[in-house]
């Protein structure tokens, strides 16, 4: 029996703060994927790999992927819930060297075989970062309203997105663009001071070269 079985899901203390962080990483992956996956392949590294069972990190990651938050009592039965929902879970530790000691790689597969792969890290103090999305470098913290575009790298897209946001008086706090190469695939991550309205999201989707647009609320 692990510590989580004894104390339960109340999020207090540094040990259970780690559970909350793991749930946030799983939730962020779920929000980016925008649907419940049919399969989740999870690899934990570093400290996560050494303590993921006894500390409840495994259940927290699965809970987040299922859309269950750290303060939800269902977290402790996340594996059973995944089975009920017919979500296949494969979780393995790895001793491979990584840049950060608390790292997890999550690969989600949907009903249409669409795949999302993210790399997330725990920074301590309850903070997380998603540092890779489908092979792209990324910086996602879950602390802001976020707009993400998946698009073809071509002139004018960044300007048009910025203009559409300005027309709705949406203030941009940060904007980062990552691309696989010139005139190739690109991801733009925009943190805003407020939620981007649905009509603006639909307008951005119509921009030539934009493949997908998603919005993420603060966790």
Where are these regions (language model features)?
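Short glycine/threonine-rich loop-to-helix capping motif typified by GTGT followed
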Residues: 51-57, 101, 189-191
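A conserved regulatory-domain signal marking ACT and ACT-like small-molecule sensing domains
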Residues: 77, 89-94, 118-219
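Alpha-helical scaffold segments in soluble metabolic enzymes
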Residues: 5-6, 24-32, 60, 64, ...
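Contiguous domain-boundary segments centered on the initiation and propagation of an alpha-helix
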Residues: 68-116
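A structural-propensity feature for long, helix-poor, extended segments
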Residues: 41, 45-84
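Short, hydrophobic/aliphatic alpha-helical segments
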Residues: 1-10, 40-42
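Non-transmembrane, aqueous-exposed alpha-helical and coiled segments at domain scale
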Residues: 33-41
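Conserved phosphate/anionic-ligand binding catalytic regions in large, soluble enzymes, centered on
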Residues: 9-26
């Amino acid at each position: 029996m692990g510590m989580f079985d004894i104390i339960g899901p109340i999020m207090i203390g540094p040990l259970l703060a780690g559970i909350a962080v793991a749930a946030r990483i799983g939730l962020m992956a779920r929000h980016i994927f925008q649907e419940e996956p049919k399969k989740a392949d999870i690899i934990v590294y570093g400290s996560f790999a050494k303590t993921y069972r006894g500390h409840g990190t495994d259940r927290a990651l699965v809970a987040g992927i299922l859309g269950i938050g750290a303060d939800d009592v269902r977290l402790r039965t996340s594996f059973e819930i995944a089975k009920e929902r017919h979500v296949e879970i494969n979780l393995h530790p790895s001793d491979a060297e990584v840049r950060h000691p608390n790292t997890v790689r999550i690969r989600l597969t949907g009903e249409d075989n669409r795949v999302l792969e993210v790399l997330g890290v725990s920074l301590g103090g309850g903070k997380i970062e998603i540092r890779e999305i489908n092979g792209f470098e990324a910086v996602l913290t879950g602390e802001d309203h976020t707009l993400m575009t998946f698009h073809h790298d071509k002139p004018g897209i960044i300007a048009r997105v910025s203009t559409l946001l300005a027309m709705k008086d949406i203030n941009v706090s940060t904007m980062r663009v990552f691309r696989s190469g010139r005139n190739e695939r690109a991801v733009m991550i925009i943190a805003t001071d407020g939620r981007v309205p649905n009509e603006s999201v639909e307008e951005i989707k119509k921009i030539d070269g934009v493949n997908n647009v998603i919005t993420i609320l603060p966790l």
